[in-house]
Amino acid sequence: MVTCFRTNKHYDHEIRFHLVTAKHNDVVITKRPKDTMYMPDVIDDPNLYVIYVMRDPRDVIVSRHGKNREMYYSNIRLWRELHACARPLFGHDRFLCIRYEDFVNNPDVTQSRITAKFPWLEKQYKFSEYHQHAQVSEKSKVAMRNVRPIAPSSVGVWRKHLGRIVEQQAIHGSMTPDLVDCGYESSSNWETVLDGVLADKSGSLYPEKTHLWLKISQRVNALRKIAIYRRKRRLA
């Protein structure tokens, strides 16, 4: 986004939403997936525009972070929590949901959807030319495993990690309701590919379960961040 659209300011790597600063009328673009959980509480900011990239949760939970290839990054618990926060915003005037699969298969069509939704964004380069112009921080290079052309090579990679899917469903229950709701499957028939597959018990960076005390602590911390953001933006 910061490469292909004109911005007044951006950050070298992911930054928490409440720490972002900008001058009046500045276009500032940030990216931090976990900030999805805060968006329902700040979407009333008339100058906040949200793009939610939805991806097949099976592919999400088999991703590994560039820093630690031995461990899976996310899990179904976290995906469900974040998606539940995004779901109520579908249809909001300043919210746009984009499928990751559409983005990597047709980046320029996806870019056109973004400019149609938010026409004040000024395009500098095509998404398909991103890799020719991108200048990213070292942290981002590590996380993304360097700058590469946008391509669909990561779509459907869950099929190479069936043991991971088996283990996640054993812990969190069937993903079929999630997949049907998001339009990735029409029934539970896909689960037949898991028959006889041994569970992959490799760990996740994020915990599979959160205890009550942690949930309370996280909510208190969230309210603090939301209050800071609203105070900065002078929201009631």
Task: Give the residues covered by each predicted segment.
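Histidine (H) residue identity feature
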Residues: 10-13, 18, 24, 49, ...
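PAPS-dependent sulfotransferase catalytic domain
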Residues: 26-127, 136-149
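A broad structural signal for alpha-helix termini and local helix breaks/kinks
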Residues: 5-6, 118-119, 182
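Compositionally biased, intrinsically disordered low-complexity regions enriched in proline and serine
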Residues: 6, 11-12, 74, 80, ...
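PAPS-dependent sulfotransferase catalytic core
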Residues: 1-26, 210-211, 225, 232, ...
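PAPS-dependent sulfotransferases, especially Golgi type II membrane carbohydrate sulfotransferases
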Residues: 122-236
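Short, charged N-terminal helix-start/capping segments
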Residues: 16-43, 209-221
